[in-house]
Curated annotation (Swiss-Prot):
Belongs to the short scorpion toxin superfamily. Potassium channel inhibitor family. Alpha-KTx 03 subfamily. The modification Lysine amide is found at K38. Disulfide bonds join C8-C28, C14-C33, C18-C35. GO terms for molecular function: ion channel inhibitor activity; potassium channel regulator activity; toxin activity. Potent inhibitor of voltage-dependent potassium channels, with a preference for Kv1.3/KCNA3 versus Kv1.2/KCNA2. This is Potassium channel toxin alpha-KTx 3.12. Negative results: has no effect on Kv1.1/KCNA1. Keywords: Amidation, Disulfide bond, Ion channel impairing toxin, Neurotoxin, Potassium channel impairing toxin, Secreted, Toxin, Voltage-gated potassium channel impairing toxin.
Length: 38
């Protein structure tokens, strides 16, 4: 995935930031959001 500069404690927190970044499937890895490009 693509790491974005958004801190997180759970993957659910990455859904919106990833959508806002034009991507999908947010996952929280090492307290940072990682997104899957469309």
């Amino acid at each position: 995935g693509v790491e974005i500069n958004v801190k997180c404690t759970g993957s659910h927190q990455c859904i919106k930031p990833c959508k806002d970044a034009g991507m999908r499937f947010g996952k929280c890895i090492n307290r940072k959001c990682h997104c899957t490009p469309k």
